[in-house]
A protein has these predicted regions:
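Hydrophobic membrane-insertion alpha-helices, especially the h-region
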Residues: 1-18
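N-terminal alpha-helical signal peptides/signal-anchor transmembrane segments
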Residues: 31-52
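Short linear motifs at secondary-structure transitions and domain/linker junctions
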Residues: 15, 30-32, 93-98
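Aliphatic-rich helix starts adjacent to a transmembrane/signal segment
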Residues: 19-34
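Low-complexity, acidic interaction segments enriched in glycine
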Residues: 47-145
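Short amphipathic alpha-helical segments, especially helix-boundary/capping motifs
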Residues: 15-22, 38-41
Length: 145
């Protein structure tokens, strides 16, 4: 009887130590995945700017970016290698602008009153962002480095 109690308490102790650690590791992996997806959106915005000469407008800008990725002849043929998702996810252009954490779309704002134009790409579920609406030196720069 005492042996069973010792084994049960040992198991509970083991779980109380490993479960929080596993949760922290899972959260770190999710943060890495979200940041990678944001970097892919940044890469798509840079390609969009280099091919069209401008960034997409604020209103429906990310939707326009996805449509451009799907329809631009050069980008569409190479999209799965240019914008490779982290495993186990596989590339889907419609999921490019979606946070893997909650499924919410990233937010995008363009400031076209500055030269060069600057944008802000934000994750709705964290403080992570790429770019800045006021400082041109932060163009394409993530805030987590």
């Amino acid at each position: 009887m005492l042996f069973v109690i010792v084994v049960a308490l040992s198991y509970l102790l083991y779980r109380s130590l490993t479960d929080p650690y596993k949760a922290v590791i899972a959260e770190q992996e999710m943060t890495e995945n979200v940041r990678h997806r944001m970097e892919l959106v940044r890469d798509a915005l840079v390609l969009y700017n280099s091919r069209t000469g401008d960034y997409p407008p604020t209103e429906n800008g990310l939707t326009a970016l996805v449509e451009w990725v799907k329809t631009d002849s050069l980008i569409a043929t190479q999209a799965d290698s240019l914008f490779a998702f982290l495993p186990p996810d596989t590339f889907n252009a419609d999921q490019l602008i979606v946070s893997p954490r909650t499924g919410a779309s990233f937010t995008y704002t363009l400031n076209d009153t500055l030269r060069p134009n600057v944008y802000l790409l934000e994750d709705p579920d964290s403080e992570d962002q790429i770019g800045d609406l006021r400082r041109t030196t932060m163009l394409n720069a993530p805030n987590w480095n």
